[in-house]
Amino acid sequence: MQKTKNTYKKSGVNINLADRFVKHIAKISKKNVQKKKKYLNKDNIGAFGSTFDISKIKIKDPLIVSSTDGVGTKIDLANKFNKFDTIGIDLVAMCVNDLIVQGAKPLFFLDYIAVGKIKFNNLKQILNGIIRGCNISDCSLIGGETAEMPGIYDKNKFDLAGFSVGVVSKKKMLHKKNVQNGDVVLAIPSSGIHSNGYSLIRSIIENKIITKKIKKELLAPTKIYVSEILNLTKNNLINSAAHITGGGLVDNLSRSVPEDLCLNLDLAKVKTNSIFKWIKSNNINDREMLKTFNCGVGFCLIAKRKNMNKIKKYFSKRYVPYEIGFISKDKNKKNIYNKIRW
């Protein structure tokens, strides 16, 4: 009896389907290349490495800023609800929102997608979200990797990682050393949960039937703050900033305040979203909520009080910043007052 020959496809890796996906990427990336043609090489797609002409960036004393991140176990809910069109936006947001904390303009983005089995339509939706996120951020998707890994991932499982690079003038860079006594702390609303705390959420909904409204809120894409923050830095309106991710409001804001000054926060001023009230109703205490979720605040600014009204003009009605605290000289590193009004 003749033995059947082993092939890569039989082991679970479909090169033909992977090539088809690469061709799809090349096709939909043409518009992006045309839009950014003075920076990008039209031959980036399919090359071993991607190029970006930084000599065309007219910034004095430029500093390169980089960030890499993922979307954590939010991907499991995308699988559970069979909805993949927003998770790519999350991936871009988690990277570029970190760049703008230092005032950097995102230049380009690369993605890494690992799957147990290539599912073309699902990957198309994920990629469309990534491109949408790049368009919102005004940065270029210049490369990436899609890895099919049977045996490492279940055939229905996948993971995402992103990498982004930005640039900022040395004089325009946001830094905690710019923060001064008397500065005001402003909260910018989040669009929802963003991309942190999903392991806890998954444990909450494991044996529950949830409504369509809750499903929609659980997968709402992370707000990208690039346009607003870059306008503020361009006009020298803010001193420091914080992206509110894992660790929550207090821990992330503390990273943006110098050691010799005190962060004063009034939690009663925080305007929380309905989804967080729903999460808390599942027997989660205040401390756990604050350490795990953004609780309605996706990004924070530290600025001179006199700049508050000017700052607000750069935001749409839904995302207008509001005061939640101030900076002072104090023996304490931080003073936290009151509780969030759920």
What are these regions (language model features)?
Residues 41-44, 64-67, 108-109, 140-145, ...:
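General beta-strand structural signal in soluble alpha/beta enzymes
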Residues 39-40, 52-56, 97-98, 131, ...:
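A generic local secondary-structure boundary/capping motif
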Residues 2-12, 21, 27, 122-137, ...:
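Glycine-/charge-enriched secondary-structure boundary and capping motifs
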Residues 80-159:
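A glycine-rich phosphate/pyrophosphate-binding beta-strand-loop-alpha-helix module
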Residues 150, 154-209:
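Phosphate/diphosphate-binding glycine-rich loops and adjacent basic-rich segments that engage nucleotide
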Residues 64, 107-114, 127, 142-145, ...:
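Beta-strand segments within the central parallel beta-sheet cores of soluble alpha/beta enzyme folds
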Residues 69-72, 112-118, 145-151, 166-168, ...:
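Acidic, glycine-rich active-site loops and adjacent beta-strand->loop/helix elements
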Residues 2-100, 138-139, 150-151, 180, ...:
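N-terminal glycine-rich phosphate/pyrophosphate-binding loops that anchor nucleotide-derived ligands
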